[in-house]
């Protein structure tokens, strides 16, 4: 999952990436978000939920997952109602925990079967996640809630897949060109985060935005992959999306990065063009808030280590304390 909280690489700037990132933000027409700070109230509500429900939050790692969920909900969905924002924050916190919880692999293997049968889960983490999925239709149109749940179940399957020895022994090749996107669309949960942009009470017409979901998913995946590339390169990671796709397409990683950037910009342009044709401006506004908040989260969050690039470190300075995740 793109927001995994494991990050221990040393911090140095890579000059070539600095110019690439600066150009990306310029070409995307990124604007620093400026919204009312709801973080303290949301954090208090999440803590109350954790105490009441038994959801894990007291360990150092659990607190980091908690904070990422809190931070991204504030950044991505700033004008959502408090109840919707809280639901998304809890979902994100628990999903990120599941993604990093290698020790819970045996329990996770049976998650989907138990979920489908309505059986209790063996841990507080998985039980709370199952309950969160079951309550999606409170905040989202029933069909949309179904898509969110299905995307989340695919995320669980992809998490298990990424831990399988068979996956790690695969030799990437040009004959499996679509494999990187297949895995990414499932492991990153982009469909759920795209649908989260449009809660039922504010965005009741699913026809107004449904056609844009595939491009929103592309933006969500690729922008994360681009802005994670710095810390992953420093850590020596070669199993990320950019490097895997580069092998499949027989390109150099930096050349692949440039292509993915162009595809990201094009995907956003199509979404903006589509939503701008709608008579109700709320759909375009909601996307614009998410689009800018998504970049802001990555640029200012400590774990992405992008503060080493002068052109990016100054972006969002005014609001950095609010979204310090």
UniProtKB/Swiss-Prot annotation:
Motif NSE/DTE motif, residue range(s) on this chain: 224-232
Alphabetic keyword roster: Lyase, Magnesium, Metal-binding
Pathway participation: Sesquiterpene biosynthesis
Enzyme class: lyase
Keyword flag Coiled coil: no
Residues the entry annotates as binding Mg(2+) 1: 99, 162
Pfam families noted in UniProt: TRI5 (PF06330)
Protein EC: 4.2.3.-
Cofactor(s) required for function per UniProt: Mg(2+)
Motif (DDXXXXD motif): 99-104
Residues that, per the record, bind Mg(2+) 2: 224, 228, 232
Any GO molecular function: metal ion binding
Comment block on domains: The conserved DDXXD and NSE/DTE motifs are important for the catalytic activity, presumably through binding to Mg(2+).
Function per UniProt: Sesquiterpene cyclase; part of the minimal biosynthetic bip cluster that mediates the biosynthesis of bridged polycyclic sesquiterpenoids derived from sativene, isosativene, and longifolene. The sesquiterpene cyclase BipA acts as a versatile cyclase that converts farnesyl diphosphate (FPP) into (-)-sativene as the dominant product and (-)-isosativene and (-)-longifolene as minor ones.
Similarity comment: family membership: Belongs to the trichodiene synthase family.
Name used for this protein in its record: Terpene synthase BipA
Native organism: Cochliobolus sativus (Common root rot and spot blotch fungus)
Organism lineage string: Eukaryota, Fungi, Dikarya, Ascomycota, Pezizomycotina
């Amino acid at each position: 999952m793109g927001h995994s909280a494991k990050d221990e690489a040393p911090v140095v700037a890579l000059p070539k990436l600095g110019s690439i990132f600066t150009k990306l933000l310029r070409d995307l027409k990124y604007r620093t978000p400026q919204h009312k700070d709801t973080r303290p109230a949301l954090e208090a509500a999440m803590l109350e939920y954790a105490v009441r429900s038994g959801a894990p939050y007291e360990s150092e790692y659990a607190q980091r997952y908690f904070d990422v969920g809190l931070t991204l909900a504030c950044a991505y969905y700033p004008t959502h109602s408090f109840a919707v924002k809280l639901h998304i924050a809890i979902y994100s916190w628990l999903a990120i925990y599941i993604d990093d919880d290698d020790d819970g692999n045996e329990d996770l293997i049976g998650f989907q079967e138990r979920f489908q049968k309505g059986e209790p889960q063996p841990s507080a983490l998985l039980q709370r996640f199952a309950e969160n999925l079951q309550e999606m239709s409170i905040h989202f149109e029933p069909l949309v809630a179904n898509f969110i749940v299905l995307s989340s179940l695919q995320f669980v399957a992809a998490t298990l897949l990424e831990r399988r020895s068979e996956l790690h022994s695969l030799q990437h090749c040009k004959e499996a060109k679509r494999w990187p996107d297949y895995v990414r669309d499932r492991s990153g949960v982009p469909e759920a985060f795209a649908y989260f942009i449009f809660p039922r009470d504010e965005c009741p017409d699913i026809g107004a935005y449904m056609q844009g979901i595939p491009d929103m998913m592309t933006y969500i995946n690729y922008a994360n992959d681009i802005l994670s590339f710095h810390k992953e390169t420093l850590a020596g990671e070669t199993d990320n999306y950019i490097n895997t796709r580069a092998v499949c397409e027989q390109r150099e990683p930096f050349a692949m990065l440039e292509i993915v950037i162009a595809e990201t910009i094009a995907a956003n342009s199509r979404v903006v063009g589509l939503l701008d044709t709608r008579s109700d401006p709320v759909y375009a506004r909601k996307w614009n808030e998410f689009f800018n908040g998504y970049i802001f989260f990555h640029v200012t969050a400590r774990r992405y280590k992008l503060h080493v690039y002068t052109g990016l470190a100054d972006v969002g300075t005014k609001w950095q304390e609010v979204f310090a995740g």
